[in-house]
Swiss-Prot record:
Major location category of this protein: periplasm
InterPro entries: Asp_de-COase-like_dom_sf, BisC, CT_DMSOR/BSOR/TMAOR, Molybdopterin_N, MoPterin_dinucl-bd_dom, Mopterin_OxRdtase, Mopterin_OxRdtase_prok_CS, Prok_Mopterin_Oxidored
Signal peptide residues on this chain, from the entry's feature table: 1-31
Designated gene of the protein: torZ
The name this protein goes by in its record: Trimethylamine-N-oxide reductase 2
């Protein structure tokens, strides 16, 4: 039901489960290598892990780098934190009466049970719910970042089990790019956000101006969907050394802007006004005759309709630089200068994703493509636009060699009965609370009327929805509705503390796996070797679902595993990659030798791929290489969207003022920016020692402009209460001139820690609005919120976010 990021990006490899093989000669499950160093990997790259006496004592990056990655130091914290779930647990009220628990989720104590008891209880209630309500009542979308690896993919393994059981309700899209990945196929014929970018060597050689629009790669390139190849940061370092001018458009002076120093010009518009700023630039280009009419005529459709809007012919409002300045807070002269600079130089517009995680977020990337089209540089070396330079090292040229396939939710030789009777469904990922609140409700999505399933059971594996979903208090209320909620987790997250049944799962350091580095480059294959024994009673997801499959039917375990254990699957994946490498005339060692060598494999560079230009073929021949849009061209005006008739997503890029922004704020309200943190992967590692690098008064920091802080009597280091109609949080003040006046920043990902309505840890999503971006994409809009702030003068409550819950003996 779910198309993953990796599947968007990867166009090679084979489906897992097509062939049954037996294990090769036995290999050690884990071992302390020479010097106690074991090679493994995580989202934050290949790592050498040091083990002493069965415990991880340190971890360091395994790849050479110029810019250090703090996340690579966290292996010991991940395995040995006191936040680990140690045993299978069941909520007491649920254990007493699964059909009618006396207490609500989040209000109960837990009882330790055996694995056998836990799995039996899950199986019995799962079967009951499925038989009574059908497969659509089982939600197994289970969105989240999980751990790296091609085998131990929590979400996929869950869905593999649910397919064997008869189907489930899943999700579509993701929280990262939910708006863009739905609008972009209408504009350029692909999701775009997960496509390879024009190569970095061509950027460095040909780009004269680089615009970083709402992106902070110094933070976001510490990670990747598989494992970072670490080259993106190296290329940004080379860009800095080149001295090329960088324009950074962002309400906050990010780590990236600080990194570029004097090379960077920082422009700080009012939050949520990016479309208006782009329109002002576009209007200036048009009035000065600097828009590329030839490109617009040959490669796009619908520009004349858009120009009527731009000039004000259609609505009596010219989108001039003066009009833009009033909305954005960016001076008119600077807007004009921006337009002239972009037109006079080979300009690469690099955009992040935060700007589309807003109400009407679909308009942001659409308008940026339109601006790039007006400049006429799309498909040229170093020109045009790119939406993935900040993610997974987009632009690092794709290597030639083997590509690892991955575990599939489909089982060889098995077809889900639900697929035949219409029982499989998917809801937009950020509309889970809407679905729980409105079972059977109708909603519009991408031109079609859809129906929410009546969800009775939820299983979440490898994700933390209580941190990544908006409006936490609304989520908690909706979370009471299902009859059973199971969470498979390594840690006592807020989601785990609101589950009926909690299963302790291994970290990636307690099992064996494989991964690629570089979602675009496929640069390395890395052995993810088990470093330590499973902690406490933790088990692998693969083994948990295999056991549950046996409870479904005799022989279910054999069907689920396809007769392969952990090492046999890894050999199967590796052998497939080796076969692909051989076809490319790249030599890889045999699997046993590779595994025992404790070394990664680097694939061969490709001179052809180093010259890759996004949309280069389209520019060379737009007929032969037509885009996947109805016209085959870039669609500035979409007749498809015109037919949809959505007022919140018109047929061309449009400035639509959000419900909560500077223009609707009272004199005491500030706009809330929820940026990506420097020392976490979203909510992952919130418990780690890295917390000492950023926490203020042991809380999530809030960045406040100097003048705003003075106005509210707040000093650096003070505790600050932040609130609105949705909730309240406690934060620690960081006072600076490095943020737009009228904007505060609380980085996303802090674990919710609620007591008497106050989140003691400072989770931003307690404050954000759970509204759809529009009827088109129904994506999250976490960057559209207004808040109040005040100095907190009460006694600071004890932080309990990382504590074990109360357990009844």
């Amino acid at each position: 039901m779910t198309l993953t990021r990796r599947e968007f990006i990867k166009h090679s490899g084979i489906a897992a489960g097509a062939l049954v093989v037996t294990s090769a000669a036995p290999l050690p499950a884990w071992a302390e290598e020479k010097g106690g160093k074991i090679l493994t990997a995580g989202r934050w790259g290949a790592m050498n892990v040091e083990v002493k006496d069965g415990k991880i004592v340190s971890s360091t990056g395994a790849l050479a780098k110029t810019i250090p990655n703090s996340l690579q130091s966290t292996a010991a914290d991940q395995v040995h934190t006191t936040a680990r779930i140690q045993h299978p647990m069941v909520r007491k009220s649920y254990l007493d009466n699964p059909l009618q628990p006396a207490k609500g989720r989040g209000e109960d104590t837990y009882v330790q049970v055996s694995w056998e008891q836990a799995l039996k209880l899950i199986h019995e209630q799962h079967e009951r719910i499925r038989k009574a309500n059908g497969p659509s009542a089982i939600f197994a979308g289970s969105y989240g970042w999980r751990s790296s690896g091609v085998l131990h993919k929590a979400q996929t393994l869950l869905q593999r089990y649910m397919n064997l059981a008869g189907g489930y309700s899943g999700h579509s899209g993701d929280y990262s790019t939910g708006a863009a990945q739905v609008i972009m196929p209408h504009v350029v014929g692909s999701v775009e956000v997960y496509e390879q970018q024009t190569s970095w060597p061509l950027i460095l050689e040909n780009s004269q101006v680089v615009v970083l629009w709402g992106m902070n790669p110094l933070n976001t390139l510490k990670i990747a969907w598989s494992s970072t190849d670490e080259q993106g940061l190296e290329y940004f370092h080379q860009l800095k050394k080149s001295g090329k001018p960088v324009i950074a458009i962002d309400p906050i002076r990010s780590e990236t802007i600080e990194f570029f120093g004097y090379n960077a010009t920082w422009i700080a518009p009012n939050m949520g006004t990016d479309v208006a700023l782009m329109l002002g630039i576009a209007h200036t280009l048009m009035t000065q005759g600097k828009h590329d009419k030839v490109f617009l005529e040959k490669y796009t459709t619908g520009y004349p309709q858009f120009e009527e809007y731009l000039t004000g012919k259609s609505d009596n409002t010219p989108k001039s630089a003066a009009w833009t300045a009033e909305i954005t807070g960016v001076p008119e002269a600077q807007i004009v200068k921006l337009a002239e600079l972009m037109a006079a130089n080979r300009t690469m517009l690099m955009a992040g994703w935060g700007i589309q995680r807003q109400q009407y977020g679909e308009q942001k990337h659409w308008m940026l493509v339109t601006l790039a089209a007006m400049l006429g540089q799309i498909g040229t070396p170093g020109g045009g636009f790119g939406f993935s330079y900040h993610y997974s090292n987009g632009g690092n040229p794709t290597r030639v060699g083997g590509v690892l396939p991955e575990m599939s939710a489909a089982i060889a030789g098995q077809a889900s009965e639900a697929a035949d009777d219409g029982g499989m469904t998917a809801i937009p990922v950020a509309r889970i609370v809407d679905a729980l609140e409105n079972p059977g409700g109708k909603y519009q999505h991408n031109g079609k009327e859809q129906t929410y399933p009546n969800i009775k059971m939820i299983w979440w594996a490898g994700g933390g929805n209580f941190t990544h979903h908006q409006d936490t208090n609304r989520l908690i209320k909706a979370w009471q509705k299902p009859e059973m909620i199971v969470v498979s987790e390594c840690y006592w997250t807020a989601a785990a503390k609101h589950a009926d049944i909690v299963l302790p799962i291994t970290t990636s350091f307690e099992r064996n796996d494989l991964t690629m580095t570089g979602d675009y480059s496929n640069q390395h294959i890395v052995p993810m070797k088990q470093a330590v024994a499973p902690q406490f009673e933790a088990r692998n997801d693969f083994d948990v679902f295999a056991e549950l499959a046996e409870l479904l039917k005799p022989g279910g375990k054999e069907i689920y595993t396809e007769g392969k254990d952990e090492m046999a699957w890894l050999k199967f994946f590796y052998d497939a990659a080796q076969k692909g490498a051989r076809a490319q005339r790249v030599t890889m060692p045999m699997f046993n030798a590779f595994w025992q060598q404790n070394k990664l494999i680097e694939m061969r560079r490709s001179e052809k791929n180093e010259q890759y230009v996004r949309y280069g073929d389209f520019r060379a021949d737009p007929v032969k290489n037509a885009l996947g849009t109805p016209s085959g061209k870039i669609e500035i005006y979409s007749k498809t969207l015109e037919k949809f008739g959505y007022k919140d997503c018109p047929a061309h890029p449009t400035w639509l003022a959000p419900d909560e922004w500077k223009g609707t704020a009272d004199e005491k309200q500030l706009q809330l920016l929820t940026a990506h943190p420097a020392h976490r992967l979203h909510s992952q590692l919130n418990y780690a020692q890295l917390r000492k690098k950023y926490a203020v008064a042991d809380r999530e920091p809030i960045t406040i402009h100097t003048e705003d802080a003075a106005r509210f009597g707040i000093a650096n280091g003070d505790l600050v209460r932040v609130w609105n109609k949705r909730g309240q949080i406690l934060t620690g003040a960081v006072v600076t001139d490095g943020i737009k006046k009228g904007v505060v920043c609380v980085h996303e990902g802090a674990w919710p820690d609620l007591e008497n309505g106050l989140c003691k840890n400072g989770s931003a999503n307690v404050l954000t609005a759970d509204i759809p971006s529009s009827q088109l994409a129904n994506a999250c809009a976490g960057n559209s919120a207004l808040v109040y702030i005040e100095k907190y003068t009460g006694n600071a409550p004890k932080l309990t976010a990382f504590d074990q819950p109360a357990v009844q003996a």
